[in-house]
């Protein structure tokens, strides 16, 4: 084991995971709010947080975006953006009843799962949706066939979940889960329901998979892994878990560099750094500066994939992407 501890004389260094940070769906959603503010002027209303990041939401609020929990808090007729996490048909119906001018910033990879729910439920399937109850994405997805969807929160739940009829059964998932934990959940579902069908393609999205793969690469080499991301960001929280499961001696999540407890760096030679899919790169740069001041001036990039996916903007904003 080439792990180096106290007094080894090995230079302190940072392993910077790549890919990290913004995914295509987040980029599109944030630009949608910015463009809507440019085009319509403030206020522009957003149902829920546009993406699960404290910094992004705060900076858009300063520019005139108003974040609300439900559409009934929005004045009739106002410009309204649905967040990247997607909405149920019931929310769309409420928005239409209020005459809201809707811009739908749902990530296309979430919409794909919505379409799977619609297709499988129409074909008479019962759907086991692997995901976290109460998460906005899961609420939106399950809302497309509420009486045909059961949510499976964990591998343990797969062992006990009560399924009404099992002749036509399929599993789907939230886009931001731990790949390994989801495989374990599916394995256990299959033990109980051998004929359960798989989704037509991966529901866990490319960005979630890529960020987890990059963390797996740096984790075994790191004394500490720092994940930049917010507490309500499912994919960021998963990165901490994945780091710990793959050999990181310690792992923490923080929103801002100044939240880093210097005591965490005690006896630490190698710091792994990554960020969740809704995190602007400036927050990672701030962290690297704080680490440099603490002696971690050497930064090595560890790249496991190249991402070049870009989504076109939501309807109503398309011709103006810059």
Swiss-Prot record:
Q: Report the catalytic activity.
A: isopentenyl diphosphate + 2 oxidized [2Fe-2S]-[ferredoxin] + H2O = (2E)-4-hydroxy-3-methylbut-2-enyl diphosphate + 2 reduced [2Fe-2S]-[ferredoxin] + 2 H(+); dimethylallyl diphosphate + 2 oxidized [2Fe-2S]-[ferredoxin] + H2O = (2E)-4-hydroxy-3-methylbut-2-enyl diphosphate + 2 reduced [2Fe-2S]-[ferredoxin] + 2 H(+)
Pfam families under this entry? LYTB
Its UniProt pathway annotation is:
Isoprenoid biosynthesis; dimethylallyl diphosphate biosynthesis; dimethylallyl diphosphate from (2E)-4-hydroxy-3-methylbutenyl diphosphate: step 1/1; Isoprenoid biosynthesis; isopentenyl diphosphate biosynthesis via DXP pathway; isopentenyl diphosphate from 1-deoxy-D-xylulose 5-phosphate: step 6/6
Would the keyword 4Fe-4S turn up in this protein's UniProt record?
A: yes
Cofactor requirements of the protein: [4Fe-4S] cluster
List the active-site residues: 137 (proton donor)
Question: What is the name of the protein in this document?
Answer: 4-hydroxy-3-methylbut-2-enyl diphosphate reductase
Task: List the source organism.
Answer: Tropheryma whipplei (strain Twist) (Whipple's bacillus)
Q: Which gene encodes it?
A: ispH
């Amino acid at each position: 084991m080439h792990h180096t501890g106290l007094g080894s004389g090995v230079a302190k260094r940072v392993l910077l995971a790549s890919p990290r940070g913004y995914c295509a769906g987040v980029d599109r959603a944030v630009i949608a709010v910015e463009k809507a503010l440019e085009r319509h002027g403030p206020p522009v209303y957003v149902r829920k947080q546009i993406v699960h990041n404290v910094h992004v939401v705060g900076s858009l609020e300063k520019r005139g975006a108003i974040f609300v929990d439900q559409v009934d808090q929005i004045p009739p007729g106002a410009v309204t953006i649905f967040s990247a996490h997607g909405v149920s048909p019931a929310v769309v119906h409420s928005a239409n009843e209020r005459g809201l001018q809707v811009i739908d910033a749902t990530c296309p990879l979430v919409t794909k799962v919505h379409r799977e729910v619609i297709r499988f439920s129409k074909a008479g399937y019962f759907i086991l949706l692997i995901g976290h109850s109460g998460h906005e994405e899961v609420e939106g997805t399950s809302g497309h066939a509420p009486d045909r969807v059961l949510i499976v929160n964990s591998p343990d739940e797969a062992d006990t979940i009560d399924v009404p009829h099992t002749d036509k059964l399929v599993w789907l998932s939230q886009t931001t889960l731990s790949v390994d934990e989801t495989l374990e959940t599916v394995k256990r579902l299959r033990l109980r329901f051998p004929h359960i069908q798989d989704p037509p393609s991966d529901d866990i999205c490319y960005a979630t998979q890529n960020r987890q793969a990059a963390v797996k690469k740096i984790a075994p080499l790191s004394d500490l892994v720092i994940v930049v991301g917010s507490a309500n960001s499912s994919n960021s929280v998963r990165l901490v878990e994945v780091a710990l499961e793959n050999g990181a001696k310690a792992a923490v999540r923080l929103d801002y560099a100044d939240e880093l407890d210097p005591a965490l760096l005690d006896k630490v030679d190698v710091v792994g750094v990554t960020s969740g899919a809704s995190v602007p790169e400036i927050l990672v740069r701030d962290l690297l500066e704080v680490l440099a001041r603490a002696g971690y001036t050497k930064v090595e990039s560890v790249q496991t994939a190249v991402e070049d996916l870009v989504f076109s903007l939501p309807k109503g904003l398309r011709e103006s992407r810059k």
